[in-house]
């Protein structure tokens, strides 16, 4: 071993994919939201190495649904794939049938898939 070998950096390992949740504020695009909603908030879950990658996947999925993304909320959720059920039971206990199960989540998110929380809609402001 040479004198400087101990200072060599270890090869960078690729980031492990985990479930990343990105909160989006959406508006009608080519498709209207159910009336009388002006917009909605939703959390989009995808497998990603970082929040930026997750935000891109999430926005693309929203556009494909016919909606526009007005805002990406900067704080992301990071959930280990094997802790999905624990996350759901602690965060979304009233929606057990809305989300894929622990056994189904990896397949649901494979190949760029995105899973959405329930949409929380809001009406236009009254003037």
List the model feature ranges, each with a label.
Residues 2-41, 52-65, 70-72, 76-127:
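Long, contiguous binding/interaction regions
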Residues 43-46:
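Short, well-ordered beta-strand elements within core beta-sheets of diverse protein domains
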